[in-house]
Amino acid sequence: MGEKLDKDSILYKKRHSIAHVMAEAVLELFPNTKIAIGPPIKDGFYYDFDFEKHISEDDLLLIEHKMREILKTGSPFIREVITREQALVLFKDEPYKIDLIQNFDVTDEITIYKSHKFTDLCRGPHVDNMNKLDPKAFKLTSIAGAYWRGDERNKMLSRIYGTLWNNEKDLKAYLKLQEEIKKRDHRKLGRELNLFSVHDEIGPGLIFFHPHGARIRALIENFWREEHFKNGYDILFTPHIGKSWLWETSGHLDFYKESMFEKIEMDRSDYYVKPMNCPFHIAIYNTDKHSYRDLPFRWAELGTVYRYEKIGAIHGTMRVRGFTQDDAHIICTYEQVNFEVREVLRFAIDMWNKFGFTNLKAYLSTKPEKAVGDDDDWQMAVKVLEKALIDFNIDFDIDEGGGAFYGPKIDLKIIDSLGRAWQMSTIQFDFNLPVRFKMTYTAEDGKEKRPFMIHRALLGSIERFFGILVEHYGGAFPVWLAPLQVVIIPVNSIVEEYALEVLSRFQNEGIRIKFDNYCNMRMNAKIRQYQSKKVPYMFIIGEREVVEGKISIRTRTNEQINGLELKEALEFVKLKISNKEIL
């Protein structure tokens, strides 16, 4: 769920059209190449090719030059409807096109687009002619491998990515942003700041947190727990595996098996590592009988789950195979639904603000064609979700029919410092699992009723959120999240006794502080070193500071604060931490 590509937008049409121009250029330069597919995507386009010989990013400029030659012709993009038989003849030498055609439904209309010397199997839409494409407003950006149809059992193709904008100015702005994104790439900063690593020889998509990264993760998780206790939640811990009957009852084996790891056979039973926490929370609920007086239950867990992601989809900490889900389930009565949804939304907004995200975007997904549950419950749930968004003045789009088959939901996106939207929090009604697991409570009239169940995530997964935080702050975390908050840098060995006194005082107050008494490096070099490691504060201690009992502070942003009393310096740092200030 999220922003959809607008097929009627001029940029969509331009990007689709330039993908065809790129394909023609490639075929002219590399005649024996086979073509696959080439759609527009967010911010650009790509085309998949099966090259006879290996090409590299060094060839991109050559392809760009040929594309500009083709654009000069001003050729039109002409749409034609053809029969299945005509299509099979037309693309007889293109195996990937034949594969597509053979998998079309017999009722599908087959269309092609012709432009200059190129013809492609395509639904469109496109611009009228090549004069609408600014030759200075596009750039080919990279080459990557991509399996045909996204299936690892198929051949690996070469995917050429590009970007196109309405004009050169917009292109330059986009490319500048991409350079900043590269600098902030959490995989790059993860290595440079020694935060985490991945080891494919041990297992792809599995994250190893190093001491500094683990410190940040622990701070996030501790804060998460504290906030949940403050907001009336109880914390659960559940197992990592469960017998197959559990996943059969939940429906995971019917509808989600492709994303689950293979079964584990032991003790004459089949087990699966859990892809989700929900059935375990329900098992706890069903341990006892409940009255309406017991509800609501607000149960949260940082539960590690395992999902089989294809190798090509794995990406740093953002897309992994084992991750810790920030999960909660609210089990309540009909009368409590409105309050509980409002409270979840308030909690989500408050949580994001404290991590430095104040710009949110929401999507409300409503009932799809095929759905379970009572119509009245669906209507009520949608109204409750919509009212909560309106009451909190959150900008939202409605995705008609975009809900899960088991209930409507709100998806919340945060906007990071680079203007990118990240899907994070979800508030999801579930009209399915309470029925499958026969969840009940005794109502005020003594009758057994089905409770309402709301799935809720705030951070999504800890690993993914960690990666987003790294990129949002460029590794320069707020002081409260910085793995190392202060470094003491002595001017010489004479001041060591006072420096150790400062170290002890700050350590006793819980400040994460280090004393760097390594002598074989100049002080300015040390300052630069710790600034590059994104340490918030460097305490510079010389003989003057010793005599006056004071501290001079250099920040990672190169601000200088001189002559603070020891107590003042301590209060200064503690205030930055308690206020969760961004340096």
Swiss-Prot record:
* Catalytic: region residues: 185-478
CDD domains hit by this protein: ThrRS_anticodon (cd00860), ThrRS_core (cd00771)
Per its Swiss-Prot or TrEMBL entry, what cofactor is needed?
A: Zn(2+)
Q: What is its EC number?
A: 6.1.1.3
Q: Which residues are noted in the entry as Zn(2+)-binding?
A: 278, 329, 455
GO BP: threonyl-tRNA aminoacylation
**The keyword Isomerase is annotated on this UniProt entry:** no
Cofactor: bound how, per the entry note?
A: Binds 1 zinc ion per subunit.
Q: Which reaction does it catalyse?
A: tRNA(Thr) + L-threonine + ATP = L-threonyl-tRNA(Thr) + AMP + diphosphate + H(+)
Q: What is its main location?
A: cytoplasm
One Gene Ontology molecular-function label: ATP binding
Where it sits in the cell: the answer is: Cytoplasm
> What are the annotated GO cellular component locations?
cytoplasm
Q: Which UniProt keywords apply?
A: Aminoacyl-tRNA synthetase, ATP-binding, Cytoplasm, Ligase, Metal-binding, Nucleotide-binding, Protein biosynthesis, RNA-binding, tRNA-binding, Zinc
Which Pfam families does this one have? HGTP_anticodon, tRNA-synt_2b, tRNA_SAD
Q: What class of enzyme is it?
A: ligase
Q: How is the quaternary structure described?
A: Homodimer.
Q: Which family does it belong to?
A: Belongs to the class-II aminoacyl-tRNA synthetase family.
Q: Which NCBIfam families match?
A: thrS
Tell me the PANTHER family matching this sequence.
THREONINE--TRNA LIGASE, CHLOROPLASTIC_MITOCHONDRIAL 2, THREONINE-TRNA LIGASE
Q: What is this protein for, i.e. what is its function?
A: Catalyzes the attachment of threonine to tRNA(Thr) in a two-step reaction: L-threonine is first activated by ATP to form Thr-AMP and then transferred to the acceptor end of tRNA(Thr). Also edits incorrectly charged L-seryl-tRNA(Thr).
Q: What is this protein called?
A: Threonine--tRNA ligase
Q: Which organism is it from?
A: Borrelia duttonii (strain Ly)
Q: Which gene encodes it?
A: thrS
